[in-house]
């Protein structure tokens, strides 16, 4: 479950047209949300409210053997952000839950299609300031975001504890839609990094059976270097997103490679229904020849109210056209001879050509409507609860999480069942000596949120 300040930050990105999915940090966000979801570790209560249209605050209490708390304050000069923020009683559950992420393809020619909207870039710099104080430890967290025109964004994060250790991290990002670049520097061991994601812009090909191309292919990479000890790090990830043309079900495939450690990881996620998602992840290490298979799913449940069915949009056919002209048929109008005697033959030729391609045009509209209707049914559904489960065959663990809305409160409860490591007589760990009957809960917690 997203915390209230994380929800405000996500809406701030949406209000300023910043695509968070177009970054290397979230290139495998879907599989991470389904397989490696966060589980509460204690009893946590959060109360949040919107003091003014530009300021938000949160009070949090946590009971884990001792009572701890935190106070959070956020301020921004972003106009109309309060219209994107909703309270816990009216917000959709899918907006507060880290779940399947729809990756919209990047279209280069915005002007050629009136239905595509150009991303709105803020004309003036927009800023956001965030601060959080923990007690009784007296630790501090701070973040400052500056959104500039021309697709630039600067982020400054700082954390300080009573022991004296402080970490400062700076991000300089440029997100143009077709690619995203990030330059990162952290005072922790003088860490310097560079990350980028590039989206391939492609048009429909003759070998593609689907006339409506709604798929996207992205490749990203990151390079790190700790300047104090000269420790390098790098990784590369490939992501492919598409939809089933007959059902509109979205699917995401990723392939990651870390050449320094010899780690290869692949994930496959598919939303088989509006309320059901499956995800698998396979890890393999080239050097140690070790592998692991992780499985996960999430199941949504909506209210008992019957959704209202939307009427399908009518498809324009040849019979609906009273007379063919250049405005109606710009594709074949240049083939006609502009003579007075050839008017009837020209009309017959245009009609024959459009009848030939009418089935293809109707197929494009049908595929597009199926995909758009599937996404709209999920985003507008009134879900009341979601159940997540994931397991790892090598780690022999079981992760459970339930999140829901009850009387205006957002509740999250979860547990992780693991097995303590068992050592054989020769001192080596072996999977065949492990027993699922010995698993016990290693993590359990409940989180309660309310916001007005």
Curated annotation (Swiss-Prot):
Pfam families given in the database record: MDM10
Alphabetized UniProt keyword annotations: Membrane, Mitochondrion, Mitochondrion outer membrane, Transmembrane, Transmembrane beta strand
Protein's membrane topology: Multi-pass membrane protein
GO-annotated biological processes: establishment of mitochondrion localization; mitochondrial genome maintenance; mitochondrial outer membrane translocase complex assembly; mitochondrion-endoplasmic reticulum membrane tethering; phospholipid transport; protein insertion into mitochondrial outer membrane
GO (cellular component) term, any one: SAM complex
Localization of this protein: Mitochondrion outer membrane
Major location category of this protein: mitochondrion
The keyword Aminoacyl-tRNA synthetase is assigned to this record: no
UniProt keyword Transferase present: no
Family to which the UniProt record says this protein belongs: Belongs to the MDM10 family.
Quaternary state and interactors: Component of the ER-mitochondria encounter structure (ERMES) or MDM complex, composed of MMM1, MDM10, MDM12 and MDM34. Associates with the mitochondrial outer membrane sorting assembly machinery SAM(core) complex.
Role played: Component of the ERMES/MDM complex, which serves as a molecular tether to connect the endoplasmic reticulum and mitochondria. Components of this complex are involved in the control of mitochondrial shape and protein biogenesis and may function in phospholipid exchange. MDM10 is involved in the late assembly steps of the general translocase of the mitochondrial outer membrane (TOM complex). Functions in the TOM40-specific route of the assembly of outer membrane beta-barrel proteins, including the association of TOM40 with the receptor TOM22 and small TOM proteins.
Domain statement: Lacks alpha-helical transmembrane segments, suggesting that it resides in the membrane via beta-sheet conformations similar to those predicted for other outer membrane proteins and porin.
Protein name in the entry: Mitochondrial distribution and morphology protein 10
Native organism taxonomy: Eukaryota, Fungi, Dikarya, Ascomycota, Saccharomycotina
């Amino acid at each position: 479950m997203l915390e209230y300040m994380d929800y405000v930050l996500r809406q701030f990105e949406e209000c300023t047209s910043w695509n968070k999915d177009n970054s290397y940090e979230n290139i495998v966000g879907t599989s991470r949300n389904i397989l490696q979801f966060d589980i509460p570790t204690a009893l946590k209560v959060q109360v949040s409210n919107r003091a003014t249209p530009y300021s938000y605050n949160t009070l949090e209490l946590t009971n884990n053997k001792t009572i701890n708390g935190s106070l959070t304050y956020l301020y921004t000069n972003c106009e109309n952000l309060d219209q994107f923020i909703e309270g816990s009683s009216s917000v959709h559950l899918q907006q507060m839950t880290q779940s399947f992420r729809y990756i919209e393809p990047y279209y280069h020619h915005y002007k050629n299609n009136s239905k595509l909207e150009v991303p709105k870039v803020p004309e003036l710099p927009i800023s956001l300031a965030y601060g959080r104080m923990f007690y009784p430890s007296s630790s501090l967290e701070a973040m400052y975001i500056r959104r500039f025109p021309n697709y630039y964004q600067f982020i400054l994060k700082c954390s300080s504890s009573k022991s004296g250790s402080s970490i400062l991290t700076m991000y300089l990002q440029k997100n143009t839609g077709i690619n995203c670049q990030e330059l990162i520097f952290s005072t922790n061991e003088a860490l310097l990094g560079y990350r980028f994601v590039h989206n391939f812009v492609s048009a429909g090909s003759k070998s593609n059976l689907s006339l409506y191309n709604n798929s996207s292919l992205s490749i990203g990479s990151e390079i790190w270097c700790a300047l104090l000890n000269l420790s390098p790090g790098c990784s590369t990830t490939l992501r492919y997103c598409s939809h089933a043309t007959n059902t509109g079900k979205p699917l995401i495939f990723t392939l990651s490679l870390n050449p320094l450690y010899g780690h290869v990881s692949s994930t496959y996620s598919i939303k088989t229904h509006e309320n059901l998602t499956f995800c698998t992840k396979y890890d393999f290490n080239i050097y140690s020849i070790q592998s692991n298979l992780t499985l996960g799913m999430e199941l949504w449940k909506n209210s008992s109210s019957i959704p209202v069915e939307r009427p399908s949009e009518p498809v324009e056919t040849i019979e609906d056209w009273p007379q063919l002209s250049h405005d109606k048929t710009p594709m074949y109008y240049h083939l006609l001879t502009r003579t007075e005697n050839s008017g009837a033959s020209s009309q017959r030729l245009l009609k024959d050509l459009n009848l030939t391609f009418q089935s293809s045009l109707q197929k494009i509209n049908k595929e597009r409507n199926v995909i758009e209707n599937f996404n709209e049914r999920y985003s507008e559904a009134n879900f009341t609860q979601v159940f997540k489960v994931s397991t790892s065959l090598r780690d022999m663990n079981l992760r459970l999480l339930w999140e829901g809305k009850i009387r205006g409160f957002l509740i999250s409860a979860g547990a992780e069942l693991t097995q303590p490591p068992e050592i054989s007589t020769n001192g080596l760990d072996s999977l065949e000596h492990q027993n699922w009957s010995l698993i016990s809960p290693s993590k359990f917690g409940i989180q309660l949120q309310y916001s007005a």
